[in-house]
Amino acid sequence: MNPMKNRQFQIRRMIPEDISEVFRIDAQTAALYWPESSYHFETERNDASRCWVAVNENGSILGFLILWLIVDEIHVANFAVHPEYQNQGIGTALLIHGLINAWEEGARVSFLEVRASNLSAIHIYQKLGYEPVGIRKNYYQDNHEDAIMMNLESEAYTKIYNQQE
């Protein structure tokens, strides 16, 4: 499980100049997407945010990840891969990259909410060791879909960190 090998993209910190492209990806992939102003807040003013993008050799953004580091916990706040680039390991690589960097800043557990119908995201999370721990009924405002709460406990998180090269 190393999507970092032989990849045709780079992962780097998100910068304000990325926001319009990140916003378009979010709008294409999410029924409830963040306004552009939220991305500006996350990249420019939120000290808890850790924002990443995957870019190809032309500099086009393929996906993004926004994490919030709160003491020793990392919360997956927003995460998407452009529809044309899904199922190519980009999402997994982004998440691993973000988790490893957060580990180096002291994170030891991670948590998130995911739509119950988002099977591809659930698959990525479970592959990395996240486990469902509860349901938030009617969590999403657009269709009242449930959110599955998932945690990555310390032991599974340690395994991800130790598998890096």
Model-derived segments and spans:
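Conserved acetyl-CoA-binding loop-helix of GNAT-fold acetyltransferases
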Residues: 87-100, 123-127
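Residue-level recognition of the GNAT/N-acetyltransferase active site
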Residues: 82, 86, 115-117, 142
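Conserved hydrophobic beta-strand within the GNAT/NAT acetyltransferase core sheet
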Residues: 76, 110-114
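Conserved active-site tyrosine of GNAT-family acetyltransferases
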Residues: 125, 130, 150
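Conserved catalytic-core motifs of GNAT/GCN5-like acyltransferases
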Residues: 113, 131-148
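Short glycine/proline-centered loop/turn elements that form peptide/ligand docking sites
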Residues: 95, 118-121, 138-143
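Acetyl-CoA-dependent GNAT
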Residues: 4-9, 13-84, 95-97, 101, ...
